[in-house]
C-alpha cells in the first residue's frame, strides 16, 4: 500500500462537527434515546473527530481493490508494533511474544479463562472499566476488589488493601494503565510496587494499556508493566483508542513467557476471529503515519479537559481529579446537593455513564473527545441542572 507522506503536514480541524446520526453509531444511534430528541451522548469511549487522512486513504485503497477475503498478520505489522513499544514505552520485546487478537476485551477474557478456576479468580481495583469486574462472571471465577484512593489530586491504589486482597489467593491481577475511569498514569514507583506484590503472591498481571498514547499534560511517560517483569505477564496494546478506529478492532497481546502464551492461545481457540484486512492496513497506516494527527489531537483534548475541569471545580456539589490521561472525566457529585445527577443530566438531554457501572457510587463518566462547541453545549446543560 502506498501513502503520501506529505499528508503529515496537514492541520486538522477538531472543531468540525460531524453528524453521526443514522450511521449505526453505538454512541449516537442509541435506541433508548427518546424519538427525535436532541440528546448529547457522552458515554461511549470513541471520539467525534475525523481520523488521520492516511487512515482514510488506506481504507479507500482496500475498497478499490475489491476483494475482502481472509488475511494474515504481516511481518511489517509485527515489526511496527515492536518498534513502537520499544520507542515509546521503553520495553524491548520479541516478535515471538506477540499474539494478535480482535480486541482487548476478548483478550482479557481469554487470559482469565486460561488462568483462573472456580476457586482461584481475579483481583482488580475499583472503580474500573466494567469488563474488568464482569469478566469474573463470564469465566465463572471469584472476584476480589480493592478500593482506589485519592492521593492529592490523583487516584492511586491503596497498596495495603491491595496486599490484603492478594493474600486471598487470586490467580490474576487485572491492571488498567492508564486507568479508566480515574485517568491515572501509574508512575515508576507504583508500577514497581505492583510488580513486587504480584511476584510475592505468584499472581499473573494482565495489563490493559490501550490508553497509553492518550497522555495529557500532567503525564510525562507511560511505563509499561513489562519494563519491570518479574514473572509471566500479559500486556495488551492497540492503536484503536488513541487514533479513533475502535470500530475496526485489532490489538496485540505481548506474552514473553512461552508456556503462558500457549495457555492463552489454547483458551482463545474457537472464539477469536481473524483480523480483517481493513484492521491490518489501518494499523499499519497508524503506526507509520499517525503521530502528526495525534500530536495535534492531544492539546485539543487538554483544552477540552481544562474547560470541563474549570466548570466542575467552580460548581457546588461537583468535583473531579485532573486527568493524567484519557478523555474520560470521572466526575463526583454530592447527592445531598444535586440528587441523582446522572438522571438529571439525562432529563436535560445529556447522556453520561452512571458510576455504579464501574463500581463507583455518586460518580458519572463523561467523554469530552468532541468538538469544543459540543462540549460547551454539554456544560450548559449541566449548568441548567446545577443552577436550578
Regions found by a protein language model. Give the residues of each.
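Conserved core segment of the aminotransferase class I/II
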Residues: 57-58, 231-302
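Helix C-cap/helix->beta junction micro-motif
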Residues: 139, 200-201, 315, 348
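Short Gly/Ser/Thr- and Asp/Glu-enriched loop/turn motifs at secondary-structure junctions
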Residues: 94-95, 322-328, 359-361
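Conserved glycine-rich beta-strand-loop-beta hairpin in the small C-terminal domain of fold type I
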Residues: 284, 300-309, 320-332
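Conserved core of the PLP fold type I
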Residues: 68-196, 213-214, 220-227, 234
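N-terminal small-domain helix-loop-helix segment of the aminotransferase-like
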Residues: 8-103, 110, 388
Amino acid at each position: 500500500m502506498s501513502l503520501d507522506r506529505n499528508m503529515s503536514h496537514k492541520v486538522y480541524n477538531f472543531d468540525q462537527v460531524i453528524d453521526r446520526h443514522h450511521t449505526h453509531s453505538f454512541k449516537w444511534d442509541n435506541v433508548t434515546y427518546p424519538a427525535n430528541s436532541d440528546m448529547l451522548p457522552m458515554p461511549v469511549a470513541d471520539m467525534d473527530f475525523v481520523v488521520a487522512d492516511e487512515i482514510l486513504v488506506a481504507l479507500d485503497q482496500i475498497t478499490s481493490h475489491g476483494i475482502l477475503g481472509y488475511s494474515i498478520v504481516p511481518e511489517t505489522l509485527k515489526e511496527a508494533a515492536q518498534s513502537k513499544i520499544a520507542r515509546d514505552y521503553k520495553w524491548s520485546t520479541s516478535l515471538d511474544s506477540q499474539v494478535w487478537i480482535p480486541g482487548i476485551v476478548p483478550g482479557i477474557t481469554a487470559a482469565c479463562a486460561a488462568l483462573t478456576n472456580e476457586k482461584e479468580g481475579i483481583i482488580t481495583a475499583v472503580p474500573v472499566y466494567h469488563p474488568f469486574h464482569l469478566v469474573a462472571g463470564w469465566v465463572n471465577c471469584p472476584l476480589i476488589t480493592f478500593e482506589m484512593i485519592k492521593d492529592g489530586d490523583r487516584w492511586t491504589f491503596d497498596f495495603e488493601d491491595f496486599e490484603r486482597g492478594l493474600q486471598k489467593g487470586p490467580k490474576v491481577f487485572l491492571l488498567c494503565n492508564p486507568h479508566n475511569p480515574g485517568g491515572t498514569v501509574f508512575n515508576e514507583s507504583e508500577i514497581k510496587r505492583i510488580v513486587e506484590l504480584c511476584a510475592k503472591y505468584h499472581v499473573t498481571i494482565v495489563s490493559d494499556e490501550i490508553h497509553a498514547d492518550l497522555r495529557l499534560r500532567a503525564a510525562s511517560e507511560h511505563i509499561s508493566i513489562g519494563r519491570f517483569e518479574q514473572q509471566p505477564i500479559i500486556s495488551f496494546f492497540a492503536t484503536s483508542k488513541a487514533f479513533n478506529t475502535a470500530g475496526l478492532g485489532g490489538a496485540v497481546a505481548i506474552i514473553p513467557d512461552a508456556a503462558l502464551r500457549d495457555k492463552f492461545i489454547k483458551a482463545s481457540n474457537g472464539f477469536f476471529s481473524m483480523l480483517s484486512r481493513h484492521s491490518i492496513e489501518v494499523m499499519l497506516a497508524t503506526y507509520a503515519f499517525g503521530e502528526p494527527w495525534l500530536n495535534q489531537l492531544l492539546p485539543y483534548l487538554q483544552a477540552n479537559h481544562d474547560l470541563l475541569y474549570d466548570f466542575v471545580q467552580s460548581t457546588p456539589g461537583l468535583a473531579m481529579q485532573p486527568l493524567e490521561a484519557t478523555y474520560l472525566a470521572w466526575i463526583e457529585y454530592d447527592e445531598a446537593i444535586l440528587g441523582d445527577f446522572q438522571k438529571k443530566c439525562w432529563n436535560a438531554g445529556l447522556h453520561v455513564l452512571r458510576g455504579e457501572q464501574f463500581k463507583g457510587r455518586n460518580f458519572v463518566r463523561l467523554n469530552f473527545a468532541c468538538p469544543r462547541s459540543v462540549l460547551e453545549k454539554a456544560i450548559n446543560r449541566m449548568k441548567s441542572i446545577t443552577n436550578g
